């Protein structure tokens, strides 16, 4: 499952970060690295962008970028 598919209020753990070159490096620099827990806080009215909580802070990313982040949803 990818981060863009996770519902509001749900949590998951990052398993892999995809993307090419600068995009991948930017995601990693923002703290989106494997084995990190993420929580979807809210989604904009039109569905893009999404706000997530990672490492104790809120981060807003485009849905297109979130599609490059593989996660394992916590049950």
Which residues fall in each region the model found?
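Absolute protein N-terminus
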Residues: 1-2
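A structural micro-motif recognizing beta-strand termini
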Residues: 17-20
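Short alpha-helix capping/helix-loop boundary micro-motifs
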Residues: 23-26
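C-terminal structural segments of small proteins and small subunits
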Residues: 44-75
């Amino acid at each position: 499952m990818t981060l863009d598919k996770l519902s509001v209020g749900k949590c998951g753990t990052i398993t892999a970060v995809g993307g090419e070159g600068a995009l991948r490096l930017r995601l990693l620099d923002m703290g989106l690295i494997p084995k990190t827990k993420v929580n979807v806080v809210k989604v904009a009215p039109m569905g893009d962008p999404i706000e997530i909580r990672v490492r104790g802070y809120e981060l807003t990313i485009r849905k297109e970028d979130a599609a490059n982040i593989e996660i394992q949803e916590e049950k």
